[in-house]
């Protein structure tokens, strides 16, 4: 098919530039996750649990930022997003179980996939979208103990979308949902017993959404390597790399 220079220029003019702040947020979320998982390599570093509390809310905020863009609210774009999450949910489960000793939950991607369906049901009035969102909430309620971050983890991407364009202090409300997603009863009990990481972990959960929103709004001049679809593979890959490191140390 012949494409004129004028058509190419028209398409180029309508392409949105990449958001460097959003890419930076994704890289920082990945770094926080890796720091958290270093606790399972063999080092005595329970304090890494604290920066690890930033990872999930920042991934949820990145999802909300992507879905807030006009071009990703189309049905096709969001189905592709869901497809990638479901594909790597399956691909990542075996590396996840190889690395994490006796996991009580699935890997984090099923939680994000259900969260995507909830957001999609909120954004689109179509009956199918609303039914899928209701089904996602039902599954999250029934299988909350099997989902990483549970029922509130499924809600967190939607909450992030609600506060995305609101004043900064709404991020602190999202922080309450983040605390609930991180087993607040366990953290509260650990804090009462004097666990040195519990109170900083609660604080990290509370401020994580606000920190992420601050970054997206004020780090516009950064230009980190863009995170594209290949980045999904980093999730199962980091389990295998850390597993190899643990075996090498042992």
Label each residue range with its predicted role:
Residues 1-250:
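Alpha-helical transmembrane segments and their immediate juxtamembrane cytosolic regions
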């Amino acid at each position: 098919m012949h494409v004129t220079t004028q058509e190419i220029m028209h398409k180029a003019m309508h392409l949105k530039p990449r958001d460097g702040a959003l890419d930076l947020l994704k890289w920082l979320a990945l770094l926080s996750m890796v720091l958290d998982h270093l606790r399972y390599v063999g080092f005595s570093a329970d304090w890494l649990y604290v920066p690890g509390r930033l990872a999930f809310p920042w991934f949820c905020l990145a999802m909300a930022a992507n879905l807030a863009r006009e071009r990703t609210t189309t049905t096709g774009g969001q189905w592709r997003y869901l497809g990638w999450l479901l594909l790597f949910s399956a691909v990542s489960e075996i590396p996840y179980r190889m690395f994490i000793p006796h996991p009580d939950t699935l890997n984090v991607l099923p939680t994000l996939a259900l969260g995507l369906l909830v957001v999609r049901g909120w954004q689109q009035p179509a009956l199918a979208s609303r039914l899928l969102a209701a089904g996602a909430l039902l599954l999250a309620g029934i299988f909350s103990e099997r989902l990483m971050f549970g029922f509130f983890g499924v809600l967190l991407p939607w909450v992030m979308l609600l506060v995305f364009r609101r004043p900064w202090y709404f991020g602190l409300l999202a922080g309450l949902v983040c605390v609930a997603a991180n087993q607040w009863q366990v953290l509260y009990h650990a804090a009462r017993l004097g666990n040195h990481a519990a109170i900083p972990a609660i604080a990290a959960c509370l401020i994580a959404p606000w920190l992420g929103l601050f970054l997206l709004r004020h780090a516009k001049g950064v230009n980190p390597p863009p995170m594209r679809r290949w980045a999904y593979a980093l999730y199962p890959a980091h389990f295998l790399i850390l597993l190899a490191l643990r075996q090498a140390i042992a």
